[in-house]
């Protein structure tokens, strides 16, 4: 201080007043400015665009000030203690206060035995009559003196001249107190001190080489730790066991409950520190200032939960703020306004500054957005959110599909597209393709001895390549037409299988299109049904379908016009009918109506107008090509179409690629485009060979979906997915993660299950399944020592909680056709990893519903509270 280094103190009970201390004490009143451009009042200083400060009083009666402390109580309101260079502590005031108590205290002096500099002062926050002073070292005196300001002065005691040589005025008129209430810290220097809020008689002092905690109830004992960081000790107002101190450019953070070493040491600064201060309105926010700097560094100490016994350091976010352009001499946090401080420069210019909080956003796995700023927490909702499922984010779609058990129907595979909402044509095509693949693969495996069924999952492209050289061509005339022109089409066993996978044919040798066309008519797909009938040379059926479609209530009257046009079909190349149809077909909006005329007007073997109509379903284009293209044309067309599907990530292309490496490439493009790892996972698990399932991309999609289910707290759904995965891919079944071993011999208790045939694996070996008499394992199979007893029912583990009603001898028989049952959860072994007590899971759950402590006598372990995940509730029944 001493005129060259001003300091700032906020009034404890007046949030609009502060004092600047250097060679004199200046009291200021801070108020809001009318406007940034308004003129200042006489004697006012502009602190910021919003605030100004007005000088209220000046006190220059106390020279050689080294430290100042403001009286913590409301009355008297302007009482300050000033520590001087000679060790005296003087009580003074700012302004006029006619309170008799204040008049008795003002001017009172507290004089040590030997003169030396007073470094720090601290009022006791609870007993405000106690004032602690920290002095420099003297070989024959104490350095920590605690004065009682209410004690009577002793004018009869002679004061040596060396004590009063710096005192102003006549020393005989002063109220002098020379006997402190407590004397501490002999033969050492005190550089900083503060009272501990948790106890009014605990004082923390930064001595010359250690931090010491003095207990005034027993002054002969102290707790201390050797350290160089003894300057600027200050207690966190929000966490009374946390203390900060500094030395040179380094700050140490202490926990008084574990005082052996700092719990944290902040990054060392290149320049010496001059001040550290905790923010009174913000938990864990520490501000530091270095010499000759215009930067204040802030350290935000995050509160992150750590496991019991873990000594990991807390997370710290460091940032710097610049309140002004000039060097900063000191700063002070505002006592009530959040993150607000006033800084002062060496030339006494001041600035009112607010540290703006970092805005943090949190986006939950359920797409809820939270915005935290300062003490406010905002929940953000999207305006004008579309109600259509097509407008939803893919994460929302996947979450809803998971709730509907999407992908888990392995019998009627096609139904999975209904579980997905039946609003995505690509998903519909995918699941129908997988359904047909499963259906025909099972039929082929039953009819043949080899693994020809795997060829079905390789896709139509691979199937048709296997028939190269065996394809036969046939000429057929139109059905239901007077024209006898022949149409060339191609057939083979593999092409017939391809048509079945496309849905154009049913199982068996019967090639009747009737059932398929009827199903299309029921779904209202009149144009598609008519086109497929036409492609199968039944022009009369196509006309009938169009007329039927036009006659329905919601039918398109244009269908009658198209039917009339079809009825006039002629195969003459230069006819007016062919010329007009070639021109006008491009004006039709429906792609199937367009390709009907493209087919009729095409040259034999040249059907580009049909094959490259992108609005037409891929399965229909593939089926058409299998009928009318020869082997060479078919191979070239499939190669080109496959590349298009892979680049676009179109799931309809799975019909061509199958669940092969090409299929993985296609799914990769689909996932890159949509982010739908859910469909990718279920699709690849449906029938992919093991080498494809081991592809790192497939494994990444599967693990991503599992993590997504966990993030949504869909733990049951994730378990169902794991079970589904292990059925379709036995190699993915994980090893047992938990096993129970005997305390005496160390052998696994699960060995006892090996003598019982067909015993369920996993946790069933630790519980009771099947017959209550056959499955009792109450002793270790290795050493025959009894298993531990349940802490509640006192029955040896291995016994069921209760016998299953209706159990009979028939229960002892094992039905291999049924799934192996897992033991009931209530019978599982359960134990606490802390106290090692436990019992039947059902009993433990019932106990901890009403109790917090362990059921074993004299054990105070709070077992359930140690399991943080036990407090989480599955969210599978919560709708978004």
Curated annotation (Swiss-Prot):
A zinc finger (C4-type) spans 740-786. It is found in: Lysosome membrane. Zn(2+) 2 binds at residues 793, 840, 843. One of its GO terms (biological process) is cellular response to amino acid starvation. Component of the GATOR2 subcomplex, composed of MIOS, SEC13, SEH1L, WDR24 and WDR59. The GATOR2 complex interacts with CASTOR1 and CASTOR2; the interaction is negatively regulated by arginine. The GATOR2 complex interacts with SESN1, SESN2 and SESN3; the interaction is negatively regulated by amino acids. Interacts with SAR1; the interaction is direct, disrupted by leucine and mediates the interaction of SAR1 with the GATOR2 complex to negatively regulate the TORC1 signaling upon leucine deprivation. As a component of the GATOR2 complex, functions as an activator of the amino acid-sensing branch of the mTORC1 signaling pathway. The GATOR2 complex indirectly activates mTORC1 through the inhibition of the GATOR1 subcomplex. GATOR2 probably acts as an E3 ubiquitin-protein ligase toward GATOR1. In the presence of abundant amino acids, the GATOR2 complex mediates ubiquitination of the NPRL2 core component of the GATOR1 complex, leading to GATOR1 inactivation. In the absence of amino acids, GATOR2 is inhibited, activating the GATOR1 complex. This is GATOR2 complex protein MIOS-A. The gene is mios-a.
